[in-house]
Every structure is written in C-alpha cells, then in structure tokens.
Amino acid sequence: MADVVVGIQWGDEGKGKIVDRIAKDYDFVVRYQGGHNAGHTIVHKGVKHSLHLMPSGVLYPKCKNIISSAVVVSVKDLCEEISAFEDLENRLFVSDRAHVILPYHAKKDAFKEKSQNIGTTKKGIGPCYEDKMARSGIRMGDLLDDKILEEKLNAHFKAIEPFKEAYGLGENYEKDLREYFKTYAKKICPFIKDTTSMLIEANQKGEKILLEGAQGTLLDIDLGTYPFVTSSNTTSASACVSTGLNPKAINEVIGITKAYSTRVGNGPFPSEDATPMGDHLRTKGAEFGTTTKRPRRCGWLDLVALKYACALNGCTQLALMKLDVLDGIDAIKVCVAYERKGERLEAFPSDLKDCMPIYQTFKGWEKSVGVRKLEDLEPNAREYVRFIEKEVGVKIGLISTSPEREDTIFL
C-alpha cells in the first residue's frame, strides 16, 4: 500500500520534515512530480539538509528512494545532490521515463519570464514540460544508449536553430551540450532504472511506499491559481500517474499546511498581510525559498483554500506545521470566506481577482515551541487547532512545533 504526502497551500508547507519524520517506516520514498525548482529543508540532529530532487528518505539507510516519471531532472543538479551523500547504490533510482532538463530550457524560461512575469524560478521546468507534451523531449533512459541520445540531440539542435540567438545560446551550444552529457551521464546512468515496474512489484509484495509531492495544490497546472501556477499536476491524483501505481494502491493522503499562509512569486493571495505582521511572520518563520532564497509573501491561514485543497486531494488527515511561528501574537486571524463585489464566497473560485478576506479572530498564546504533547499546548493554541480541524472536516494527525524532527505532536 502507498501513502501520499501532499502540500495543500502554495508550496513550502514543510513536507520535507513530515516525510523525514515518518520515512523510517517505509520501504520506498518516491518523489512524484516537479523538478529542482522545489526544495525540501530537513533539520536532522542540528544539521540542515536542503533537497531539491532527492526524496526525503535518503537520510534513512534502509529506505529506497525513487525519482519517478513525472519529475523533470536537471542531471547536473542531481549529480551535485548525489555527491553530498554516501552509499546511495541500490538506494536511489531515477525513472527511465523522467524527462531531462536541458540548459536550453533554463534560457527559454528566463526569456519568457521577462514578458509573462509569472514568478517562475527560471530553472527550465516549464519549457521541459513543454517539450514533453510536444513529444520532443529527451528522457533519462535515452542517456543509457549513445546512439539514441545522439539522435535525440540532433533533433533538438534542428528544432531550436531559429531561436538560438533570441535565447542567447551561443555558437558553441551543440559542442557544450554534448560535453555536458559526457560529464554527467556517466555519474547518473547507474541510477537510471525502470521504476514503474519496480513500484508495481513492490506494491504487489505488500511493501510500504510513501509518495511525496513538490510545491502545493494551489500551484497545480489545472486546478491552481492559473496562470500563476507550476507546470505539473501537484495533487495526490498525479502520484498514481507518475509512479504507475493504480488508485486502489493509495491508503492515506496526508495534507500538509502551515498554521498560516505563504506564497513565493506572483499571483493572487487573498489573506496576505502587507503590514509589519507579514514581515514578522517571514522573519520568525524563516520564510525564504529553499531554491531561490526569495522572500516568501506571508499572511493568515486561508480556510477557503484549505477546504478546497483537502477536497481535491481526498485528505484523510492533516499535518499542521509551524504552529510555533504564531507564538506571542495577541490576535490571530483566520480567513473563513471571501467577499467579492458584495457577495460572500465560501467556495474557492477559479479566479481570485477582487476576492477580499473575511476574517475570524482568535486570542493568541505565549509559547508552543518545542511542545511534544497536545495537553502541554496552551488552551488558546488548542482551540486554534480544533477550530481548523472542525472547519476543514479533516482530522489533524500531527502538529509541528519547531524545525527539529522530534518537536512533533502526534494526535
């Protein structure tokens, strides 16, 4: 059976800590979408680990880790991550169906961002997915056969010829790209496997599989705040498509949310707080992107968005992260509905334009940091937790009270 860990905001919810906290109980941990535009930060024994492509189970020696087919892979960045760990042989596997991000993709991404202003990381994620959908991409499995790779590269060079100058690729692009693959393919090829068959077999054997997503539900290409979204499907449903596991294999869906809201990049954010309180949340919560170091926009918890995300993912339980960041705040707001042109909205619309938050205010608490038992939380903190649980209609199974793995309340 497989369990899914999915972000139910705009990403950066703390999925890495949760996966790291529970990964020891699983045989496989699988990253199922996105690219190195996303990042997990894990604090283990006082040491901070920033992961961009590697599944969070790499810190457990007995855990097998898979990068599955819907992930787009920068071989350079993956090689750099691999070099930071030891003994990954027979513990890390990259799907032969996953698509390869080329240096050209990053150049195209940066070029398009100048006019579109979406707020992308300019890592080449979107253009790589474009080539995938156009059936012209290079897959990880192509790196295993020099002849096939050469054919794919020649087709790529022909396709981009009209755009080389616009994207600033330079006269030596073809030579440089061949050298690029020569440098990194040798390092990455031992990890490339048919992970789809591997996971199907593992599921049939009854092995435990944990599927972790990147970004968050509200960035989903189809169901998020379009066009300010990522280029992949970020919901729990995409875990099946990417891994080859059928929907019957899914057991628990754990939705991850912060006790407040953040968003990086452009796009609508109804509960954003543009006052010094937003700055306080950013500073205390260390809200800076793992990948880009960009400051995250901060605001209050949005229950309209949270209910929507829980429904989309079929969440069976929630993990409430960073409760301690709200410590010491006298009045804590929660967005319970939107108002748009005089109309109250309680359902999440396809377009958030002109949506203003309707807040309910709660009394704050002094301290929750480091608490590991529910009964040790102050009454106001417990009331806040129970209100969220009641309004969303999904059990909160875990509360995080600091970045440390052990500072976790299990309910």
From Swiss-Prot:
GO terms for biological process: 'de novo' AMP biosynthetic process; IMP metabolic process. Its cofactor is Mg(2+). The active site is at D12 (proton acceptor), H40 (proton donor). IMP binds at D12, E13, G14, K15, N37, A38, G39, H40, T121, R135, Q215, T230, R294. Its main location: cytoplasm. Pfam families: Adenylsucc_synt (PF00709). Keywords: Cytoplasm, GTP-binding, Ligase, Magnesium, Metal-binding, Nucleotide-binding, Purine biosynthesis. It catalyses: IMP + L-aspartate + GTP = N(6)-(1,2-dicarboxyethyl)-AMP + GDP + phosphate + 2 H(+). GTP binds at residues 11-17, 39-41, 296, 322-324, 400-402. InterPro entries: Adenylosuccin_syn_GTP-bd (IPR018220), Adenylosuccin_syn_Lys_AS (IPR033128), Adenylosuccinate_synth_dom1 (IPR042109), Adenylosuccinate_synth_dom2 (IPR042110), Adenylosuccinate_synth_dom3 (IPR042111), Adenylosuccinate_synthetase (IPR001114), P-loop_NTPase (IPR027417). Mg(2+) binds at D12, G39. It comes from the Bacteria. It is found in: Cytoplasm. One of its GO terms (cellular component) is cytoplasm. Its EC number is 6.3.4.4. GO terms for molecular function: adenylosuccinate synthase activity; GTP binding; magnesium ion binding. Homodimer. This is Adenylosuccinate synthetase. It comes from Helicobacter pylori (strain G27). The gene is purA.
